[in-house]
Amino acid sequence: MNSKNINNIILRDAKKTNDWLDKYFANKESPSINLINAMKYSVLNGGKRIRASLVLSAARLSGDEKSSLPVAAAIEMVHSYSLIHDDLPAMDNSDLRRGKKSLHVKYNEATAILAGDALQSEAFNILSNNKIIKNTYLQSELVSSLSRAIGHYGMAGGQMLDMEGEKKGFNFEQVKEMIELKTGALISASVVMGSIIGGGSKKIRNSLYKFSKNLGFAFQIADDILDVSSKSNIIGKPTGSDLTREKSNLINLVGLNKASKLANDLIKEAKDELIEFGSNGLELSSLADYIILRKV
């Protein structure tokens, strides 16, 4: 699959996800319209929707895409919540996200915290809603997968390690663990939850989990490379902050060239897990290539 085709798939998946989110929020009622507007500002504020595309692609590979859009939307809500909190002054103190003002700059810190909290809970509301996800057994699996991916043994734990690693000089294994939790856990959840809702067998899920573990690690390395090699007006967020804050990442630990080689090796290992699927695995394989070659 060439780069034009995979770009078209990502754009198509992003449009479907955005349309679903637009419709979901269109008539959303709340005691506070400001909170709803803040939530919409974040989750509908552009973005590549790579995680959504991973959900949808994994569902297609596993057999059935038709019920996967709500899962993709829930993942994007959680991702937006994580970005809101990452940008706060107490975390990464970033005033730019996706080329626009970060939520706490657009509104205020308190509203940003509450909007992030609300987006997280709304994601679980979607997954646990019998009118949206009609298979109660799958509901349980989806909720369990996402809750583990974003809690203390997932994204939140990884963010804590990221903060603890500033100016401490983590070794390779410590950086690897941080990445696997902070970034990799939600990437893995996107793929595995896509397979769950798509009806994938345990064998398929196991292969896709192995694929996603390597993919998540490579994804964060690619992000770190962009942080030192790109410009904020291109990627839509401040660059160079990891170096300024002496963060523990692969670039600071082993240098740009070795980190880039590791990322490419990880992508190859990830794609090897898809060989058994033949042509059905081409879409996820191309997504893996996109992740390592992207410029934003």
Where are these regions (language model features)?
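N-terminal amphipathic/basic leader segments beginning at the initiator methionine
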Residues: 1-25
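Mg2+-dependent prenyl diphosphate-binding active-site environment of isoprenoid biosynthetic enzymes
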Residues: 15-16, 25, 29-275, 279-295
